[in-house]
Amino acid sequence: MSIIEIIVLALIQGFTEFLPISSSAHLILPSQILGWEDQGLAFDVAVHVGTLIAVVIYFRKEVSSILSAWFKSFGAQGSTDDSKLGWWIILGTIPAAILGLLLKDMIELYLRSAWVIAVTTIIFGLLLWYADAKGKQIKTIYQLNWKTALIIGLAQAVAMIPGTSRSGITMTAGLMLGMNKQSAARFSFLLAIPIISMMGLYYTVELALGDHLVDWSTLLLGVVLSFLSAYVCIYMFLKVIERMGMLPFVIYRLLLGVGLIVFLTL
């Protein structure tokens, strides 16, 4: 890859991983539309590591509190709001982890296309708009229960389809289940930590067992740029939804989806 491609793809991953607009779609499109070469497995791992570091650092207080309470819940302290949240994050991760392993190859073979991205971008954009407009938005993150967490986890599994958006579909589910915007977003971000970690570990093992050439300077640049852009993105996103809701991202998804359809039919 050229230096321009490295910079663009790393920034795309960072900026889109936590926005409800689908990072996978934005990484697939340059190769499908611009003819760029595939970024390769090692680069995929690098940019996911960057975004993982960003979300862990941004939510470091919450992560520390949840982990501490979760481990202490096995002892005399018993169950607390934070320990329960830890269990809900684990429960919400299971569907995507299982289905990801089972369906990964089939999805990559049949669904990694610009047409699929165009359609899913529009459909799930409209669902996000509906959830934002019609959801009661009264529940906080600590009012989750196991049923809510499992439903959001099942929604996260749907995000394996390119164009869906992991953060978008989990926030949509959270809003439809009555969560307020900040809580739906924060749970979505916390839910990203184990799933991105497992994805990174899976691909790292695949990378180690395979015959892949590794350019460490490229990987380091990918980690740094995706980390910086993801951190800024999380901060800005939480500010935007507080003032404007999900509408800007719905509009973007609709414009992108329609634009892709027009482009593909010309």
Swiss-Prot record:
A biological process term (GO) from this entry: regulation of cell shape
Catalytic activity: di-trans,octa-cis-undecaprenyl diphosphate + H2O = di-trans,octa-cis-undecaprenyl phosphate + phosphate + H(+)
Membrane-traversing stretches: 1-21, 39-59, 83-103, 113-133, 141-161, 189-209, 218-238, 244-264
Cellular localisation: Cell inner membrane
Enzyme Commission code(s) on record: 3.6.1.27
Top-level EC class: hydrolase
Principal cellular location given in the protein's record: membrane
Keywords recorded for this protein, A-Z: Antibiotic resistance, Cell inner membrane, Cell membrane, Cell shape, Cell wall biogenesis/degradation, Hydrolase, Membrane, Peptidoglycan synthesis, Transmembrane, Transmembrane helix
Topology within the bilayer: Multi-pass membrane protein
InterPro entries: UppP
Cellular component annotations (GO), alphabetically ordered: plasma membrane
Pfam families: BacA
Gene Ontology molecular function: any one: undecaprenyl-diphosphatase activity
Family: Belongs to the UppP family.
Note: Bacitracin is thought to be involved in the inhibition of peptidoglycan synthesis by sequestering undecaprenyl diphosphate, thereby reducing the pool of lipid carrier available.
Function: Catalyzes the dephosphorylation of undecaprenyl diphosphate (UPP). Confers resistance to bacitracin.
PANTHER family per record: UNDECAPRENYL-DIPHOSPHATASE
Name of the protein: Undecaprenyl-diphosphatase 1
Organism: Pseudoalteromonas translucida (strain TAC 125)
